[in-house]
A protein has these predicted regions:
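Cation-handling catalytic/transport regions enriched in His/Asp/Glu
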Residues: 1-201
Length: 201
């Protein structure tokens, strides 16, 4: 069964074991954080699942789409000009279905169209730092799709571990940038959101 899963993910056992080793090493600190979060929310015996996503800290900072766009283009353009240019194209050419509306599905996703070398991104942007992070995440998938443009069609299906690496990296780079100017309360909110989201990846 493991061999089949590894083949499907295009991953060797050594890579999987390295990932599990990193997870095991980080787990004690992550558990301590969630115990502390539980205490902060009034739970003495750990954090119940129903409060996993309960917000902590306080952030009144919101972003317009224009501010989110400028932040992402500047940050990712400096990191990788090709990624910054792809993001500019995504914003300017209408790749992104940005806002929530009646009848629209919740959440977010990205779908690539190989023949046209474009992607389509759906988000429900309401202006929070988490929404900007979600946008960065989905545009990470779009950039991964863009990088596959010279591959044969049969090689363009990205296995989940690789697909989530690109998008999670984008979130991490963005959060690192936001932390540079965050107040202590905003810092707590950003870090909590980041850690909580990682339990789902």
């Amino acid at each position: 069964v493991l061999d089949m899963a590894l083949a499907h993910s295009r991953m060797d056992e050594k890579t999987l074991e390295a990932m599990w080793t990193a997870i095991r090493e980080a787990l004690p600190e992550l558990r301590e954080y969630f115990k502390a979060k539980g205490r902060l929310l009034g739970h003495e015996n750990g954090l119940p699942f129903y409060d996993l996503f309960a917000p902590v800290g306080q952030s009144t900072r919101t972003y317009t789409v224009e501010e989110a766009r400028a932040l992402l283009l500047d940050l990712f353009g400096k990191f990788c000009p090709e990624m910054g240019e792809m993001m500019r194209t995504a914003f300017d050419e209408g790749w992104i279905d940005m806002y929530p509306r009646e009848g629209k599905s919740g959440g977010a996703f990205c779908s690539g169209y190989y023949a046209k070398n474009i992607s389509r991104v759906m988000t429900n942007f309401a202006g929070s730092a988490s929404d900007v992070s979600t946008l960065a995440h989905e545009l990470g998938h779009a950039f991964n799709n863009r990088m596959l443009r010279h591959k044969p069609l049969m090689m363009t299906e990205t296995p989940m571990p690789l697909a989530e690496t690109a998008s999670t990296f984008n979130e991490t780079l963005l959060i690192s940038q936001l932390l540079k100017t965050a107040t202590p309360e905003e810092e707590l909110t950003l870090l909590d959101s980041c850690l909580t989201e990682q339990t789902q990846t």
